[in-house]
């Protein structure tokens, strides 16, 4: 009996051990399976993160748009607090209350513009590409003697002494290639004086700095802008400097130049003219290289027929779309003629036209039609 009882006890013990071992093995298997799945999932998540990070590491244009969006919002906030400080110091209660009422609208409008600029920049990245904007400039590839250019651009002639006069609405615009140069990043640029008169008063006095590449491309390396305003009651009534907005120079505070006019443009080409973030961010897109009046109803819109026929009868005028990433939704179309250069700007949304009325270097400029 005692022996039988001991045998039974040992059998029961072995059975329990076998069951326990089986359970442990099963649990271990389950743990390993789940552990394996967890590792696989972690590997997959890690791979996805790496792919996402790799993509983010190369979407430099979009990164720029996002960074500038945050900068814009911060600037709006800064502006609101400055405006608040101004309101606090207004003694008249009615004026002070009105000032505070304007704060909310200013914030809403400012943040709306920030979002619109972000979207405009992001959309532009799809056309411009995601690469860093960092043009490599070799001074040896540029002319330094503007009296003897290697390959002059017929659509953007930079001959010293050339002068153009444009008119439209209440505006007169005079551009002249001056006998002056600027040395920027080792490249010699010609200075173009650009003066804008509104209602007879000088409103803008700008010096543009253009560089001529030996392959015929024209580059834009900066501008010195003086925005002016004249005030009734001043004696003498002289224009007063009110801002230098838009001024930039390649190599200063992160500013970079850009292409201004290609020697061999093709329809669909798109490029930055200037890269001065939050200050000057103009983009050019080539719409046509074979324009003549009557060939495209969209491009004919607001175009003075006589002017276009004077310069584009051969069907070789170039039309560009020009827009600023700082002014979402707005654009202009510019028209260029061989041997003349820029002769017409149309702003379709506003219906505004600025047209060439005179030049001093080509007989086709004689008796041009008036606006």
Where does each model-flagged region fall?
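N-terminal secretory signal peptides that target proteins for export/translocation
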Residues: 1-17
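Intrinsically disordered, low-complexity segments enriched in glycine/proline and serine/threonine
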Residues: 6-8, 21, 44, 51-53, ...
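Bacterial N-terminal signal peptides
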Residues: 20-32
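Soluble, non-transmembrane alpha-helical interaction regions
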Residues: 40-133
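Conserved functional acidic sites
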Residues: 113-371
């Amino acid at each position: 009996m005692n022996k039988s009882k001991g045998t039974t006890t040992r059998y029961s013990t072995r059975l329990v051990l076998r069951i326990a071992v089986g359970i442990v093995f099963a649990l271990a298997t389950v743990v390993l399976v789940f552990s394996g799945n967890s590792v696989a999932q972690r590997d997959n998540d890690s791979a996805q993160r790496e792919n996402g990070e790799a993509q983010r590491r190369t979407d430099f244009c979009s990164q720029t748009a996002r960074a500038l969006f945050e900068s814009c919002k911060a600037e709006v906030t800064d502006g609101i607090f400055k405006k608040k400080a101004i309101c606090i110091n207004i003694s008249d209660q009615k004026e002070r209350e009105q000032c505070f009422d304007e704060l909310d609208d200013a914030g809403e409008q400012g943040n709306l513009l920030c979002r619109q600029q972000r979207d405009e920049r992001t959309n532009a990245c799809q056309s411009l590409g995601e690469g860093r904007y960092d043009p490599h400039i070799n001074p040896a590839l540029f002319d330094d003697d503007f009296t003897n250019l290697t390959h002059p651009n017929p659509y953007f002639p930079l001959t010293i002494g050339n002068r153009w006069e444009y008119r439209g609405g209440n505006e007169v615009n005079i551009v002249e290639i001056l006998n002056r140069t600027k040395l920027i990043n080792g490249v010699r640029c010609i200075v173009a004086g650009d003066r804008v008169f509104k209602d007879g008063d000088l409103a803008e006095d700008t010096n543009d700095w253009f560089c001529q590449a030996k392959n015929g491309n024209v580059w834009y390396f900066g501008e010195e802008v003086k925005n002016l305003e004249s005030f009734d009651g001043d004696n003498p009534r002289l224009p007063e400097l009110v801002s230098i907005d838009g001024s930039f120079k390649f190599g200063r505070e992160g500013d970079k130049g850009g292409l201004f006019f290609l020697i061999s443009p093709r329809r669909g080409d798109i490029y930055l003219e200037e890269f001065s973030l939050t200050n000057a961010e103009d983009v050019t897109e080539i719409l046509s290289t074979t324009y003549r009046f009557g060939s495209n109803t969209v491009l004919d819109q607001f175009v003075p027929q006589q002017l276009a026929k004077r310069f584009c009868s051969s069907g070789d005028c170039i039309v560009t779309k020009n827009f600023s990433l700082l002014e979402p939704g707005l654009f202009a179309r510019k028209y260029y003629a061989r041997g003349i250069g820029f002769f017409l700007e149309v702003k379709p949304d506003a219906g505004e036209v600025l047209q060439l009325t005179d030049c001093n270097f080509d007989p086709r400029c004689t008796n041009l039609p008036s606006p």
